[in-house]
Amino acid sequence: MNSGFVTLVGRPNAGKSSLINSFIGRKVLIVSEKPQTTRNKIRCIYTDSYHQIIFTDTPGIHKPVHRLGEFMVKVAIQAMKGVDLVLFVVDATKGFGEPEKRICDLVKLSKTETFLVINKIDLAKNYEFLAKTIVSECDCFSKVFFTSVVKNEGIEELLQAIKNCMPEGPMYFPENMLIDRPISFQIAEIIREKVLLFTREEIPHCVAVIVDTMEKRQNNLLYVAATIYVERNSQKGIIIGKNGNMLKQIGTLSRIEIESIVGSKVYLDLHVKVKKNWRDKDFIILNEIGMKDEIE
C-alpha cells in the first residue's frame, strides 16, 4: 500500500474544502462562499484498494485582525510541516496577490514537494497566464494543475498525480473512516455552515458553535443541545430572527444533514448566547473551539 499526508494551503475561499470533498467523493467538510469558513486543521481520509491519503484542510492564510485569525494562520502554517505533499490552491478569479506571495515564501521554507492548483477555472479565462505568472515568481512547483469542482474538471487527474507521489506506508486509519474529528465537531460545523448560509456582513465571522450535550434517547433518537455564540446582542437578534424564524431555518436544515450522517432521528435544541469579543480571548479559542491541540 502507498499512503501519505497532503496539506492544502491557500487564501481564504480558494476552494480547498470543496476540492477535498471531491477527492473523497462526498461532503465531509462544510463549504460556504464566505471567506474563512475553515477555522480548524481537519484531516480527511481517502482510501482505495492501494492507497490511503490523509488530506489536511487548513484555514485560509490571511492578514489577521483578531486573535482567532492569528491562531488560524498559525494552524495553517504548522500543517505544512512533516507532510509528503503540499497543494497550493489558488482562486483563478483572484489572481496573484499578497496572500499568494506570502504562501509562496512559506512553501519554499517548507522544502516539501508542492503542486500548484489553479482552481475555479470555470469562472476565469486567463488562468493559464496566471499559472505562468505564479511559477515565474515562485519556482518551487513540481506540477501545475487546473481544476473546477463545479464542472468536475481536472479533479481525477490531480488525484491520480497525488497517488503517484505517495510513498509505501501503512493504513493509518480504518478504511471506512472519512474524517479524524468526533461527531460532535462535525455537528457543530454543520450548524455553523447553516448560519453562514443565512447571514451576511459581520455575522459569519463572529459565530462559534459548541455542542453542549449529545445523548441517545428512546426509539434511537439522538438528542443534541448546541449553543451558537456571537459577540453582541444585535447579532443574537439577527440569528434568532423575527418570531424565531431564522433560528428555526438554521435548525431545520442542520437537523436534516445531521440525521444523514448519524443514521437516526435527531432532536436539535439550539440556543444563542453572547460572549463579548470572544475572538480575542485565548481561552475560548484554544479550549472551547478546539485549537489547543493544533498549535502545540
UniProtKB/Swiss-Prot annotation:
InterPro entries: G_ERA_dom, GTP-bd, GTPase_Era-like, KH_dom-like_a/b, KH_dom_type_2, KH_sf_prok-type, P-loop_NTPase, Small_GTP-bd. Residues 147-149 are annotated as: G5. Residues 57-60 are annotated as: G3. It is a peripheral membrane protein. Disulfide bonds: none annotated. SUPFAM superfamilies: P-loop containing nucleoside triphosphate hydrolases, Prokaryotic type KH domain (KH-domain type II). PROSITE patterns: G_ERA, KH_TYPE_2. One of its GO terms (molecular function) is small ribosomal subunit rRNA binding. Residues 199-276 form the KH type-2 domain. One of its GO terms (cellular component) is plasma membrane. It is found in: Cytoplasm; Cell inner membrane. Residues 10-17 are annotated as: G1. Residues 36-40 are annotated as: G2. GO terms for biological process: ribosomal small subunit assembly. Coiled coil: none annotated. The keyword Membrane applies. Residues 2-168 form the Era-type G domain. Monomer. Belongs to the TRAFAC class TrmE-Era-EngA-EngB-Septin-like GTPase superfamily. Era GTPase family. This is GTPase Era.
